[in-house]
Amino acid sequence: MNSNYKLDIAYIAGLFDGEGNVSYKKYPKKRKGSKKDYMTWNIRLEISMTDKDVIELVHETLGCGTFHKKPPSKGQLGKKMQYRWRCGYRDALHVCKLFWPYATVKLHKIEQIIDHYEPDIQELGDNVVDLEKERFIRTQWP
């Protein structure tokens, strides 16, 4: 891993902490041919903004998720094109592990996603990992 990659991850993690959205919730969903609702997980990360270059950097650096544009609706004349990066489920786990050392505002939600997929990592009452040690290791430059 080169230092530019680490810098890009740190930048994107900070951007995500301020501008991103974490969806981690259960909701009822019907399966085909069934009358009964089943609880289904929705696990997703998203960043939306009008700066295309930044969203392209996010998509290229993280190497997962989708990049697409959302034009303003007809009633929003004069508004800018919005660009969006999204990832979900196992890709969200991968990204959460990258963002975790840098997260502050969304740390709890990021840890929930990591715990959802890797519950055996922690003991009861512990954090996902030793926060101080992991942040030190992940932020050291080669």
Q: Each predicted region: which residue ranges?
A:
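Internal intein/HINT superfamily modules and their associated LAGLIDADG
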Residues: 1-142
